[in-house]
Amino acid sequence: MAYTTCTVPAGEKVSISAGKLNVPANPIIPFIRGQVSVNRRFVGTVQDDGKMLRFVNSVDGPGLAELGTSCPDHFLRTKIKPLFVNWDPASGDIETLKTAIADGLVQYREDYAAYYDRCKRPDSPAMRDPNPTVVLIPGLGMIAWGKNKSESRVTAEFYNCAIEVMRGAQAIDKYEGMDQQEAFDIEYWPLEEAKLQRMPPEKELDRQIHVIIGAGAGIGKETAHRVVKEGAHVVCVDKDEAAARATADEIIAKYGPGIGVAGTGVSNCGVAIGLGCDMTDRQSVAKLFETVMLAYGGIDAVIVTAGVFVPPDKSGHVEDKMWDFTFGINVKGAYIVADEAHKIFKKQRLTGNIILTTSANAVVAKKGSLAYDTSKAAANHLVRELAIEMAPLLRVNAVAPATVVKGSTMFPRDRVIASLTKYDIAFDESEETDALTEKLSNFYAKRSLTQTPIEPADQAEAIFLLLSKRLGKTTGHIIPVDGGLQDGFLR
């Protein structure tokens, strides 16, 4: 019998323009992640190339998928079979698709439990997570799931191999899956279970996907490195896309590209990617999250460290356009990012975190930074309002730095020199920027109660604390990380 996925168009069960889903994947992927992550969170890999679409769109696709894979090494990742969603993509009806996915998952879990009960032996390990690791959807392709990006890519790679085995078998005769008892004895092999039990404990942020806005420099860059160290996958985002990519490249260079040869486009990525985004443009932010869904399948935390300081002109006046620019980034931009992220979290139905960056200036009134200070005061209250609006699904908190000069794009050389001049600190304009920055940082340190410079790493540590279980019951709170500025004490 000919393999129907190779006989286009005669072998197609559905016919879609260009073979791909004619509705956006963004509403579907996070929904699936939430459904399969009821026990433990998963990271996804999406494959929607021509080969995969021919399979999921074919007449024989559902039946072949039901037979499962035939290689023991494969179904340790892919499980005994994938979930094939019974849906007509020509309709483009998202709600019908969601219902089909939910119903399919209920049946899949029942089938897996029945398979376990039917095949288990007296000494078999306890049943593992009954959720599928491979989901096949006509018109959309395949979404593979794993505890991290490498595992989901390997799972996707293995199912690609399974499709090739099916194609070859169907081309010459008929494909047959492995006997279920034999498959079970391999999947629940005591030595395999022993290997799983010897695995090191998961890190605190394992299985999580964090989006960091402002990751091109300073606090954002430091935070990206900090959360990856704890197991998170990181989407490094910046208005300067090259800077965002540079941060992601640093992470990949340190931790490696991962394993597994699968995933279409951006989904064939490692533990970090770098993307550009204008946080004041809702379309740009929505596009960012759509890309994140394709890359990793969902989000668990969104951290905004991007901000802007615009000094007044020589007369001490802030022009209207510069006022709008400051509030556009420090307040409106933070709100747009949080609002678009909230939409994703509601689709996932998984709890998560949003962390903003405000400032000690939010509560300290002074001359020379009118637009910045008032925008940060607004950002402080934005945190509280969002915490109320987005509870109980999300915790919303912030860190409030003060005078983080090192690595900050808000302290370019000219501003550092202006500040040194303002405070009558001796310097020579021939000095390197790093030396000038250190002088200013040390000056600011002397004004604090702890007498220590405040660096990006200090903010990153506070952000990690808010992300962690240690402050898992804290929301609507701003943590000052300013060395102790008594004028900045929150009241």
Model segments located where?
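Canonical Rossmann dinucleotide-binding motif of NAD(H)/NADP(H)-dependent dehydrogenases/reductases
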Residues: 205-235
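Conserved glycine-rich Rossmann-like NAD(P)H-binding loop of the short-chain dehydrogenase/reductase
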Residues: 232-246
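Short C-terminal tail/terminal secondary-structure segment
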Residues: 309-312, 464, 475-491
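Substrate-binding pocket helix/loop in short-chain dehydrogenase/reductase
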Residues: 313-315, 319-324, 444
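Catalytic Tyr-X3-Lys loop
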Residues: 319-335, 355, 372, 379
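A short, exposed helix-loop element centered on a Lys and neighboring polar residues
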Residues: 338-339, 384
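Alpha-helical segment proximal to the catalytic Tyr-Lys
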Residues: 343, 388-392, 472
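Residue(s) in the substrate-gating loop at a strand-loop-helix junction
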Residues: 359
